[in-house]
Each structure stands twice: as structure tokens, then as C-alpha cells.
Amino acid sequence: MKHPRKLTTRAAALLLALLLLGTAGLTACDKGNDPSDTDPADATTQAPESGGDLTLPDGTTPADPEAPTDPAETDKPSTPEAPDSLIGDGSPLAEVYPTFSEVGGLYTARAKTVEITAPEGYTVRYTTDGSVPTKRSTEYKDAIKITADKGEGMTIRAACFDADGKLTGQVITHTYISAKAEAGLHYTVMLSCDEDDLKAMYRDVHAKVERAAHAEILAPDGTRIISQDVGLRLFGGSSRALSQKSFKIIARKDGYFGDEPYVGLGTFTYPFFPERTVIAGKNAGKVLEKYDGLILRNGGNDALLSTAADPDRPTLLRDGIANEFIAKYAPNVQMSYAHFAVVYLNGEYYGILELRENQNEDYIKRLYGVDDNDVVVVKSELDTTRACGDHRNAGECRFCGSWFFYETDSEAAAQKEMKDWIALCKKAAGAVNASEAEYRKIFAEVESKLDIRNALEYMAAACYLVNTDWPHNNIRVWRYTGAPMDGIAITDGKWRFATRDMDFTMNRYDKGAPLPEIETTPTVDTFKWVLSNYVEGYGDHQQYNDALYLQGLFPFLMRDDAFRADFAELCRTLASEEANAYLTELYQTAYDQAYPIMGDHIDRWSGYAHGMISDARSWRKAAQRIETFIKARPAQFLKHLDKMLAMYE
């Protein structure tokens, strides 16, 4: 699907700068009442398929496809004696479906020929535009010859029709891309969706719209690991305004899309992130292999199309690097792993997106072996249309707190949990300067309801990495609400922080940005972000209102001697040579993975945003600013830390 090119004027860019202060909200699509945050039953997908003359890492041709998955292992009715076939997700859902001679994936030949067969008495009809075949679609008669320019391809969706023209059984989807596998570098994600459905999502990017689609995912070595029908939604907050969208793909169960001919497996089964191991429960220590949904993110404020401020600095690297740094040095904070994915939409190259974990209730369920019905997630949201009425310029309302608020699931129990969280933070903020007796009383209450070590690590990491889109925004907390379980620490019922949108970090914005408060250079004193509204002498410019009460929680906790000592120790660890070397390693790894594919990404989107990075050399220069930050940050951070600690001496 071709997107209209729209060059953004400078005035519009400044407006977008206000919008991009946070990519967290603006829509119910990414809130706790998201229907994607359901509890699909566990299911399995077919073992990785291979076939035809697709290229494997060793240069050989793939083996014959494996038989469909045992129905007992899926969320589907049994079909007697389902034949071996290349039916996409491998599920013997229906007795009648077309068989492809070649499995979708990457190919290097100049052309590929695909034959499709059907059981006797049935006609095959197919489409190449991503839509579901109908009785008016092209009838298959001869082999389909696929010729595509390098990096492009063709999506074929086929189905069987009976003598009355009725679609029977599963729609089978295979996408063929003219490209070679680059082992270890990135996933390949091929999405197929009706063009009208895509237009409906793009027409109102903030509407709560989900459409049926098909997802094929290839491992970095080119092996086809996923092929199944999914729910497709736009994802993110203000970054939805960018030409390249972020998507959420959801492993829906059978019947979710009503009478439409889609098959739901309920789970994506593959270890997408080998670093991710289950933390507790019966699968503790094992690599996580089941996901209910996945995110394909455009990078938010670090997207190359995010040009409203400092358009020569985005890289698509920051969020992933920051989260992995937190995984090692703030291990009690729930974070999101990510890998680069080259994405195709209906066979057309769509550029690079980050394939990420979706940090919802299902994420907690998978990590800790608990019931997701006993997990509540509360997130801050951003709505730039909310105004206080006291400012002539609505953009100034960001400072009075009108824009920022908490959201969670609409159910009464979740709403009560959210109110309890707000009340706890508000009580702490109100006790920053309380008498010692009153402070100790309230600290004991906070300590009984909040994982103190988790909060300490979360705040230290955000300050070190210079996340200036926080703590007034981009907050995610969660709590287990069920009965305690032996051996599972998080069932103590305490609130815990998780990362959210770490793209606003590590030298993304310079001092000369249109909005001075978003500066993220290595010299920034981020302690002012959590102290300026509560401690005299911090913050010499207009500062965000503490509408979410997290700014007050920090000085409240810092008043405790033990917390302050542990916080200082972790901060010095973050600024240590060892941590600095690790952060440098993370940067170099991400750079090495992105650079070989960044040129095509830039070519795909160049011209869609005013001032966007136009070539690989410019991107390399932007990426080097992260390296500059990593080198300069430790000394600056320790200086600010010592200044802050001196207040408590």
C-alpha cells in the first residue's frame, strides 16, 4: 500500500514536538482495557517449515515440510486424517484447503514459480493484494510466476471454493520476498491485510480498530517460524502520526473474528528473545517460548521520521539499548527485549520496525507463572487536547499537569487498584517534609505496598540514561492481586515499576531543541526532574507539574538513610567503568545489526518527513551521538549525584 508523501512544515514540526513529548497515550488502543490483553489458551504452531528452492544458511535447499501439528496441542477441533500440506499455520482446521508447491519466505533466484492444487471438485481462487479471496477473485489455472525487484515480493492468499462458489476451509497465505537471509541480524515479518482495512486504521489513527490479518515471521537465518492469522492494530501514542506506523499483532483464538475465514492459534510459539527466561513458576529458568502478542514499533521519538525536533539525531537504537542495559543493572525492573525486524506489508517493503515484547498482564503471567486475572497494570497516558483554561497557548498546559493522567482496565477492581496506587503516591509526596514520626509511619506503609528495591533501580536507571520524558509521563506499574504463592516473590502484592518508552534518552535531543525541557545531553542533571517541585534550589526553569505524584515519591524515599545509601551505591555502579563498557557493547551490537539494513529503510521513507536523515552517512553520525553520551555521562552523572546527596548531609 503506497502512502501519500507529506512534507511537514516547520510550524507543524513544532506542534508535533509537543505531541512527541510522550508516545504513551492519546488512545484507548494501548490501555489496560485493550482486548488484546486477554488470556488466550496455550497452543502450539507448526515446527519451522521449509520447502522449494528457498535459500538456507548452508546453501542447501530446505527439506520437505513436516506434518501438521497434533490437534491435541492446539486450540482447534480435530480433523480426521488431515493431509500433509503447506497450509500456513499447520493446523488441520478444515478438510479442504489449497496446497502450495513452495513455502513463503526469502528467495534469491531471478524468478520463482508457485503451483497451487486443491482436492477434486474444488476451485482455487487467489489474491495478491492482501485481501481474502472471494468468488470474484482470480481463478487459479496456471502456475504463478513471481518476479520481484530485490527487497520486494508478492503475497498470495488462496482458498478453495465449492461448486456453489462458497469459500470452504482455511485461507492459506504465502509471501515470497526477493532477498537473502542475513544470519543473526534481524527477523523478517510479512503481514497480509486487506487494503481497505489498512485504510480504515490509517484514516483515524487514534480510533480503537482491530482488523484480521495474517503474519509470517522468518528467523534471522531465513527459516519460517510463524505463519498464522492474527489481530492487527496500530500501536503507540503520538507516534501514530508518523507515516510509518507501529503495529500490535495479537495471537487471537478461533472464533474471535466471527464468521470471517480466519484461524486463531491463541499463541505465538517461538523463543523470539533468547535472552528472555521465565523468572518463576514451573518453567523457571527456561527460555520463554509463548507470546500472546508482539509489538512492531517504529521507534517513537527515536524513529527516523520523528523530525519535529532535532531531525538529525534519531537512530532507532535507543529504546532497545536502554532496556537491555536495565536488564543487567536494574534486574528487578521489568523491561522489554527487542530485535530489529524488516517488515513487508502485502509484499511491499515497509522498512525496519522493532519486534518487541508486549508488557501487559499476559507478559507477567508468562514470566512468573501466575494467573493474569490476578495482575493489574496501571499506565500513565497523555492527551494533548486536555486544557486547563488558564493558558492562552494550550501547549503550556503540559506544565500544569492537564495532559497527563493514569489509566487501567475499565473493570471496577482495576479502577480501585489504580485509585489505591495514586493515593499511595500522593500520600508519599505529601510527607516529603513531614515530621520524623509521621514520616516513619508513612514510610512503613509505603514499604509494605511498594517493592523498594524495584523503585530504587527504576529511578536510578531513568536518571542515569537521561529520560526527560519522565517522571511526569511514561509510567508503568503493576501488582499481583491474588493469593501468595510459595517461591514466587512477586505474589507479595507489592507495586512494581516496568520500563516504558526509553527512546527519549541518551543524547536524543540537544540544548537547542524547540522545547528546552526535553534536552537529553550527557550534562543534564536529571535529579532536577524528580526534585524541583519539592526541594528548594532544584530546577531553574519552568518544570512539569507532579500530576502523577511520582516526582514526590523520589524525595520521599530519598529521605530514608538506607534507601539513600543503596541508591547512591547503584548510581555509582551505573557510572562505573564496567557498566560503561557494557553500555558501549550494547550500542556497538545494535549499530552493527542496524547499519546493513538502514540504507533501505532510509530510502523507503526519505521524503515523508521534513528534515529526515537522508543517507547512511548521516545516520552513522546520529548514532555516534549515543557513543558520545556513553563516554561523557559517567563523570557528569557523578557530579550531579554528589550535589544531590550533599543536601542530605
Enumerate the predicted regions with their spans:
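Middle-to-C-terminal accessory/interaction subdomains
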Residues: 187, 196-204, 214, 238, ...
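Juxtamembrane proline-rich low-complexity "stalk" or linker regions positioned immediately after a signal peptide
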Residues: 41-68
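Bacterial N-terminal signal peptides that target proteins for export
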Residues: 3-15
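Bacterial signal peptide processing site
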Residues: 30-32
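Gram-negative bacterial Sec-dependent N-terminal signal peptides
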Residues: 14-22
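Short, compositionally stereotyped local motifs that mark structural "simplifiers"
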Residues: 39, 62-72, 76, 80-232, ...
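Conserved ATP-binding subdomain of kinase catalytic cores across diverse folds
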Residues: 207-397
